[in-house]
């Protein structure tokens, strides 16, 4: 099968970004994939501005000022509610950035690393700062990224390294650094875990006083508590020394298995869930030899002829976030209620900043069950305010790690969607982009491999419509096809 420039470019945009923006469609038949890749790289250069969000800090002194336990309980509840709302707002702003930013490659990689270095923490500032690490360092050196993430307050808190001290080592952080972040299971021993945990003793974070002259006053930063560090000799992965945490990171990066593990995970995410071991080995060798240069690894993948092989196209079930952003990049949406978007993510099974566990989110068929598939296929109409949501979030499943969310976050009526989302579509640009196109041409922009039977059903459904109504219904129906779930 000979693929057109349009097909190749759409494939590249869905993998290296979040699909095409509406205004990009006319140029996709003219650009070569190499030109489009160069544009994606150029658009993601430079440091991104931080997505701002604030944590409300409740101190012991604040509570002691209050006269009764009831007043103190009320203040705690208020702060907890404000924290949840701010966390939802942060997630909503990132989703909006994914949708509208030209730096698609940067945001896509930040999303990938968000799943790789998964944390589930309620502190807004911890989430904000870790997200910024992903966005700033996600295309640079994996060595720098790994060290920055390992020293982040979010990771140290989530994996309990704040409690790791020489008198009583805590192995959580040391284990996950090897199992999930670098080597993968089976490439280290329990002795290595214990020795690494000793090396990471004393790694912690501390608060910067709000009245400090420091630029990060009121926030937290990495802090090495020397008194809690075990400075004795350690044996780790066959090497001996008085290792500190940085030494463990360095030794892990010396292992070619780390390059294999990361290259394999990136291949399965961006290319095909069925691994090609020879290609992964070749990629991992180049990744290792480059000093773990993430951008070079991605270029090796996204410019390779095999990336555009038919078996690697349209083979990936879109994650809920992918699906939301894909639709939003074609339909200019205004969503007035961040809470509604949060609830919708819960229904679909993927909530930004709330991965199910330290292993991150699953892939593939894990996204699809009988109820979620129905909602996914209704999603274009729900977002356009044309249809109500008839499935409520699951408050006690594995996505929530067995923890029910507060009732005010999930207590919704079955037909809530148009009111709660407060969503509107600016249809003018959509009509301008699609009105002169046949249904087959419209489908070529929205579906990887349009099926004749499906297009026939859409054609039949819109045959009596004309003008703007026909365009709107054609686009919504194409986005509601099972084929649109693949990218």
Residue ranges: model-predicted function:
Residues 2-5, 10-24, 255, 259, ...:
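Flexible, low-complexity segments enriched for small/polar residues
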């Amino acid at each position: 099968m000979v693929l057109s420039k349009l097909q190749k470019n759409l494939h590249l945009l869905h993998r290296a970004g979040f699909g095409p923006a509406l205004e990009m469609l006319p140029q996709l038949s003219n650009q070569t994939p190499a030109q489009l890749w160069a544009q994606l790289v150029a658009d993601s250069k430079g440091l991104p501005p931080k997505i701002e969000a604030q944590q409300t800090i409740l101190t012991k002194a604040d509570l002691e000022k209050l006269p009764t336990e009831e007043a103190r309980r009320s203040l705690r509840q208020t702060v907890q509610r404000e924290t949840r709302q701010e966390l939802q707002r942060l997630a909503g702003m990132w989703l909006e950035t994914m949708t509208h930013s030209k730096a698609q490659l940067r945001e896509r990689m930040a999303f990938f690393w968000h799943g790789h270095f998964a944390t589930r923490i309620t502190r807004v500032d911890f989430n904000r700062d870790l997200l910024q690490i992903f966005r700033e360092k996600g295309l640079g050196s994996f060595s720098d990224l790994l060290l920055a993430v390992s020293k982040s307050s979010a990771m140290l808190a989530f994996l309990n390294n704040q409690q790791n001290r020489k008198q009583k080592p805590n192995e959580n952080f040391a284990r996950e650094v090897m199992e999930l972040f670098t080597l993968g299971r089976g490439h280290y021993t329990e002795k290595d875990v214990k020795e690494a945990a000793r090396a990471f003793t004393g790694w912690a974070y501390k608060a910067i006083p709000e009245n400090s002259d420091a630029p990060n006053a009121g926030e937290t930063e990495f802090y090495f508590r020397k008194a809690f560090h075990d400075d004795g000799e350690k044996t780790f992965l066959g090497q001996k020394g008085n290792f500190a945490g940085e030494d463990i990171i360095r030794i892990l990066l010396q292992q070619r298995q780390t390059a294999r593990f990361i290259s394999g995970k990136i291949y399965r995410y961006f290319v095909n869930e069925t691994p090609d071991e020879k290609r992964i080995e070749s990629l991992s060798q180049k990744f290792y030899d480059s000093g773990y240069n993430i951008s070079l690894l991605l270029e090796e993948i996204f410019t390779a002829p095999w990336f555009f092989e038919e078996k690697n196209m349209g083979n990936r079930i879109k994650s809920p976030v992918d699906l939301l952003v894909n639709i939003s990049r074609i339909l200019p949406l205004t969503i007035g209620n961040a809470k509604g978007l949060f609830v919708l993510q819960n229904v679909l099974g993927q909530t930004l900043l709330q991965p199910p566990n330290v292993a991150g989110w699953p892939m593939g068929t894990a996204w699809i069950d009988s109820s979620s598939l129905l909602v996914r296929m209704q999603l274009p109409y729900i977002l356009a305010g044309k249809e109500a949501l008839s499935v409520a979030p699951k408050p006690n499943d594995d996505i929530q790690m067995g923890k029910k969310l507060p009732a005010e976050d999930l207590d919704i009526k079955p037909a809530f969607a148009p009111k709660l989302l407060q969503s509107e579509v600016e249809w003018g640009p959509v009509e301008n982009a699609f009105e002169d196109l046949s249904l087959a041409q419209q489908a070529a922009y929205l579906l990887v491999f349009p099926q004749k039977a499906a297009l026939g059903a859409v054609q039949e459904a819109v045959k009596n419509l004309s003008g703007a109504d026909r365009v709107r219904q054609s686009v919504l129906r194409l986005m509601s096809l099972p084929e649109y779930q693949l990218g």
